[in-house]
Amino acid sequence: LYTEKYIRDIYISNPKRALQLLDEAETRKAFPLRLINELRSLSYRNMYMNKLAFMYARKSYLLDSISQREPKHMLKMTVYLAELSSIMSKYNESMHYALSGIMQAQKLKDREAEARLLFCIGENNWRLSLKDEAYNYFGRTIELLRGSKDMREMMLLSYYYGAEMGFLMTDSRIDEALALAYEREKLLKKLEKVPEVPKATLMVNIAIYMQIWPIFLI
């Protein structure tokens, strides 16, 4: 019950139970505190309690920063902090984490982290009405992931296609959104043939796509 794997498996479906187990795991010193705080952050984020999610991601980040032993985990926490800052409309703070994280992601050759941080910067710029900069970063994100055969990167690309389509439609850039819709449709067909893609996750992607697609058929 108090293992990292078990709690990581349940925090989405039962975040409150995960938090109870994490308290006990900390008391028992069942696994490293940086991971306990990461899972607390994820559990709170899953409940949309973003301030607490940020607080525990920050605690985990600081532990990594002090030890300097787990650069990959520190990068993961940097991504969380950039995204959570953006969600809370702290755009300058988000930019700080994202820009420092991109350098680390490139050093570690972590394309998933780099893509998440690039898109986060794009979202920040869009919300600050810096639209040209925003679409530049969205484009960089998609170019980084386009053509990847890695399942996680393909799923991430599908999500970013959908997210940018939403921004384009809000800005009445319908032709560009339509072009992305076609690209996403092709990607979803490829994902259907990847055996390790969870079917439930794929169906969610298709459902989101189908919610957007009818707009272009009106």
Regions found by a protein language model. Give the residues of each.
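A "functional boundary" signal
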Residues: 1-218
